[in-house]
Every structure is written in C-alpha cells, then in structure tokens.
C-alpha cells in the first residue's frame, strides 16, 4: 500500500449511533471507519482515521499529515465547520487537497449551519447522504490519487 488518505472526524462524532440518530443515522463511528478501511484496502490505499472533540488536536493532526505524505484528507469538521478559522488555516497551510463531508444536509438545518469556513477551499463537499457520503468521498479520493486505478 502506497498512498495515504486521512479521514478526520470532528467534535461529537464519537457519539454517532447514539446522538440524534434521526439526523445522523444509526451507524457508529467505528462502523464507518471499518467500512472505509476495507474500501481503501481493496484499492491498495492506506487509510488513517482520527477523531477529536478538540479543535487544537485536529489542527495538530492536519499538520502531522503533511510530514506523513498524506495525499488527500476527507474531513467532517462537524460543528467546527461553522466556527473554525484555525481549521481552515491549517488545511490551507499544509496544502493537502481535502473533501468536506457532512452526514446531515446542513443547508436544510438551522441557519447558523449554512455557512462553512472550509467549503470554498475544498475540492468537493458532500452533505446529507449519511455515512454513504464518506464512501463516495473515498471513491473520489482514490480516483484522484490513483487515476489509473480500475476500481
């Protein structure tokens, strides 16, 4: 396995499966991560996952990705989407392409969730498709970093 993709999960995503399942679904974060790792392995891609409820820890993990040769980041910034200039600056600072993913359709929710500090810099945004959004993002990421991959 050569290329690496990093999946970052933001605050409260450790509660998936328990927190508001009518909004976020019934799968746990562990279920989602296992599915993504299996999907990446089929394409001979190394996939790392990271979750934190702390903005600074997520910023540190993004910085670390640059030294690890990560080719693409899939990020669900959760509530930090709407508040974190630090997260935006970290992603721009490492210059690793990223895809923004949200389980729920943030545009169909409260007005404060409609703004993202990341979307205008992301290569793509997927929202409202539940856990399947991560899988779609990973499909695209694999294609992006391995254009000749037949999968």
Curated annotation (Swiss-Prot):
Molecular function via GO: 3-dehydroquinate dehydratase activity
Residues at the catalytic site: 24 (proton acceptor), 102 (proton donor)
A GO BP annotation: quinate catabolic process
Catalytic activity: 3-dehydroquinate = 3-dehydroshikimate + H2O
Record-linked InterPro entries: DHquinase_II (IPR001874), DHquinase_II_CS (IPR018509), DHquinase_II_sf (IPR036441)
Leading EC class: lyase
Keywords on record: Amino-acid biosynthesis, Aromatic amino acid biosynthesis, Lyase
Site positions (Transition state stabilizer): 19
This enzyme's EC code(s): 4.2.1.10
CDD domains: DHQase_II
Annotated residues for binding of substrate: 76, 82, 89, 103-104, 113
Domain of life, source organism: Bacteria
Gene3D superfamilies: Dehydroquinase, class II
Pathway entry: Metabolic intermediate biosynthesis; chorismate biosynthesis; chorismate from D-erythrose 4-phosphate and phosphoenolpyruvate: step 3/7
Subunit structure, interactors included: Homododecamer.
Task performed by this protein: Catalyzes a trans-dehydration via an enolate intermediate.
Stated family: Belongs to the type-II 3-dehydroquinase family.
Listed name of the protein: 3-dehydroquinate dehydratase
Organism: Acinetobacter baumannii (strain ATCC 17978 / DSM 105126 / CIP 53.77 / LMG 1025 / NCDC KC755 / 5377)
Gene this protein is translated from: aroQ
């Amino acid at each position: 396995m050569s290329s690496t993709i990093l999946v970052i999960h933001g605050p409260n995503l450790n509660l998936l499966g328990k927190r508001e399942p009518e909004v976020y679904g019934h799968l746990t974060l562990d279920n989602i991560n296992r599915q993504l790792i299996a999907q990446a392995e089929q394409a001979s891609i190394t996939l790392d996952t990271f979750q934190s409820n702390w903005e600074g820890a997520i910023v540190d993990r993004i910085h670390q990705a640059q030294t690890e040769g990560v080719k693409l980041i899939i990020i669900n910034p959760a509530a930090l989407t709407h508040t974190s200039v630090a997260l935006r600056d970290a992603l721009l600072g490492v210059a690793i392409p990223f895809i923004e993913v949200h389980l729920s359709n943030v545009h169909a929710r409260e007005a404060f969730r409609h703004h993202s500090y990341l979307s205008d810099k992301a290569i793509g945004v997927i929202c409202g498709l539940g856990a399947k959004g991560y899988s779609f993002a990973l499909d695209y990421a694999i294609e992006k970093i391995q254009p000749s991959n037949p999968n």
